[in-house]
Amino acid sequence: MITPPDAGGYSDNQLTRALYVRDMTSGGHTLFDIHAALNWPSVTLPGGWACREEDMLQLLSQSSDEDIHRELRMMNIDYCGDDYVNCYLRPLNLWLRTDVSEGAAQRLERFHTAVVGQWERLAQAARRRSTIPLFLEAVSVTDETEIWMEAIRLNGQGFRVEVAAEASGVPAVANHRFEHHLMWCGDGITPSMKAIFQSSLEAGDPVMLTGTDTRVKLPENTLSASA
């Protein structure tokens, strides 16, 4: 799609073309879509993430587990890690968890199993490479799949991720050495866990809060007692 640079480097036209390909890929278009758009600019392309999601929903309804695993594997190869997780896996997870149609529970279970299975294969491959060790601790989650999607995203950024998936309300202990420690908050953080985070931070530990909701939240039993 992009010709190699000459001795003087890439031309302006080549750089423009490369940026266009990147933008199309970030929009969830396939290589076939991008090739068509480059060669026939007047063609209106269907596709994008919505079509990729529809393809997976069809597989979850009708196809074998191997077909589902193969599709996830190819999607992870064809798209960058952040786009794959943020624009594809997370919207699919949300859709499946709000779906009330017939067979919804089975589709969600198959999706969760496929995501965890993909993570296990990626983690095994990462152990064979020279990658940066990172400890991902679930402080709180809104569902059982989100911590594994985040682990896949971090793997795509070049980390070798150890996951503590159970949000138990007490600090998790890593089994391996790590250079970074991320505390994932999908549904807030309790005052006690926030205090532990602050103490670790003040001690100079390589720790950071991350996730979709890092607000301090009181435990529900405390709220009930004060109501």
Describe every region a protein language model picked out:
Residues 1-45:
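Basic, Lys/Arg-rich alpha-helical nucleic-acid-recognition elements, primarily the DNA-binding modules
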Residues 40-41, 92, 170-171:
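Short secondary-structure capping/turn micro-motifs that flank functional sites
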Residues 44-46, 137-138:
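Charge-rich, acidic-biased intrinsically disordered regions
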Residues 48-50:
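Generic helix N-cap/helix-start motif at coil->alpha-helix transitions
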Residues 54-159, 163-166:
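Mid-protein regulatory/catalytic core that forms ligand/cofactor-binding pockets
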Residues 116-227:
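C-terminal regulatory/effector modules of DNA-binding transcriptional regulators
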